[in-house]
Amino acid sequence: MQEDKLKVTFEKALGVPVKWTNFATGGEMTEAMLSGDIDISYSQGLTPFVNAVNAKAPIKLVDVAVLYGMGGTTCVVSNASGITKANASQLEGQKVAVPLGTMADYVFRETMKAVGADDSKMTVVDMVPEDGSVALVNGDVAMACLFGGKSIEKALESGSRMLSVDEAKAAGIAGIDITSVTDKFMKENPGMVQTFVEVTHEANARHNAGKSDLNIIAKDAEMDLAATKGQIGGFEFPNASTIKSKYMNKGGILMNYLDVMGNMFATSENPALKDYSAVVTTEFLPM
């Protein structure tokens, strides 16, 4: 997808200029959509999407962007703290950095359940991943939950993963990023939405066939080639058929995740939806 962004494939297919904007979190993506600054959010975490629709935001989920294990989203605990999964309850009473309302927030909650630590007894400091990793290295927090290769790499300079990628997988902790679109843009430009999704899936097919240019992707991500290969190696880009039959279908993996997360992050002001299928559509997925 990043390769096609740099090669202006999207502009050529859509027939209009495309303004690409990077955001630190999926919550910032939502805010930009609601303010009218952007029309489509690619690789928005499922957690910020759920928070948005619980708050009645006029957006829809139109595609699965990427599936990932906890290589790209994880909790890193300070080596100096002496805390590991074996004595994780010692985090209680300590400061931890978490970008609230993101997939890292979901991973934080699920990881604490898996290691038997009470997250309600920790002082949670809301920090974007870049700041959280610096806080961990500086000794300001005992643990930082993060996403993004650069932030995790920085945190690992002075910390270790609370759970390995395999341990997180065994605990049922996994991530899904999605593509969401504002209701207004979807209604006014359905053809553009369809083209955007189609070009994305063409890029995914090329990646799955081993034909992506990782040098271009590494440059765009501001990472070295080895780190890029390592991070992308933990990503999965399902095709449209798989998404329709296993993820966005009734009882599918994505729909179950929406229900679980919707209730996990529900508040009295923004309760969980009774039916999340109302904010999901498969109409733009390739045949």
Task: Go through each PLM region and give its residues.
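Short, glycine-/small- and polar/acidic-enriched structural segments
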Residues: 1-117, 123-126, 142, 146-149, ...
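Short, solvent-exposed loop/beta-turn-alpha elements that line the ligand-binding surface or hinge
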Residues: 4-16, 93, 167-171, 240-255
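Stable alpha-helical elements in mature extracytoplasmic
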Residues: 6, 25, 29, 48, ...
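Structured segments of extracytoplasmic/periplasmic soluble domains
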Residues: 13, 32, 36, 51, ...
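Short, surface-exposed acidic
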Residues: 19, 119-122, 223-234, 270-279
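Pocket-lining segment of extracytoplasmic ligand-binding domains
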Residues: 125, 130-220
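Secondary-structure end/capping motifs
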Residues: 187-268
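Conserved C-terminal helix/tail region of periplasmic/extracytoplasmic solute-binding proteins
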Residues: 258-287
